[in-house]
Amino acid sequence: MSWQRPDGRTAAQLRPISFQRHFTRYAPGSVLVKFGDTHVLCTASVAEEVPPFLQNTGQGWLTAEYRMLPTATQQRQPRETLKVSGRTAEIQRLIGRSLRAALDFHKLGSRTITVDADVLQADGSTRTAAITGGYVALHDAITWLYKQGLLDPAQGSPLRQQVAALSVGIVRGEVLVDLCYEEDSQAEVDMNIVMNEQGALIEIQGTAEAGCFDRSQLLQMLDMAQAGIQELLRAQRETLNL
């Protein structure tokens, strides 16, 4: 029996996507991103310092942190206080790697941008929402640096490319994009794809949760993810008035 998507979407259809910029008052960049019922608050802050391994190089850095509100899921999850879980550490490293691909660190200068992704409500695909919304917050933080006179327009923008991410998987033999939690929990294959606007791959995370998948299915997942990511990139440009 084929899988019927809980919200009635077609296999290649994204959930409703929205970005609410300047969501908080103090962060140079902030956005509330919604992928359907997955809501993530992404903020980007700036510190005029770099990690020890970059001191005296003139290069900047970007790092990311990821957390979930205890009541982001149906059952309350304890806060991660003294030590983050392996899942959290993996996700925040993914977010950091993905967004670092968007930057030219020589043009950023000797400063660090921290992107915080806080999941307010989770219905699957939180990490891909965090990356996609994190780029919007990062873009606004770079704009803030220009307004503060901390970046020289003559040097060119530190932003070298757009970045967005999308989940894709196989549920009951069918390839689907932008999985909700119910679909993710039933998936035989679960993947997260990160790309830029040229369609170049930044990261692929893929796991066969049950059984395996073949090359043709992999290529189909990549093709459907690329089409969906192009929609996300267009949505980013629209919200940023680019």
Curated annotation (Swiss-Prot):
Coiled coil: none annotated. It is an enzyme of class 2 (transferase). It catalyses: tRNA(n+1) + phosphate = tRNA(n) + a ribonucleoside 5'-diphosphate. Phosphate binds at R87, S125, T126, R127. SUPFAM superfamilies: Ribonuclease PH domain 2-like, Ribosomal protein S5 domain 2-like. CDD domains: RNase_PH_bact (cd11362). The keyword tRNA-binding applies. GO terms for molecular function: 3'-5'-RNA exonuclease activity; tRNA binding; tRNA nucleotidyltransferase activity. GO terms for biological process: rRNA catabolic process; rRNA processing; tRNA processing. Keywords: Nucleotidyltransferase, RNA-binding, rRNA processing, Transferase, tRNA processing, tRNA-binding. Its EC number is 2.7.7.56. Gene3D superfamilies: GHMP Kinase, N-terminal domain (3.30.230.70). It holds the Pfam family RNase_PH_C. The keyword Cell membrane does not apply. Homohexameric ring arranged as a trimer of dimers. Belongs to the RNase PH family. Phosphorolytic 3'-5' exoribonuclease that plays an important role in tRNA 3'-end maturation. Removes nucleotide residues following the 3'-CCA terminus of tRNAs; can also add nucleotides to the ends of RNA molecules by using nucleoside diphosphates as substrates, but this may not be physiologically important. Probably plays a role in initiation of 16S rRNA degradation (leading to ribosome degradation) during starvation. This is Ribonuclease PH. It comes from Synechococcus sp. (strain JA-3-3Ab).
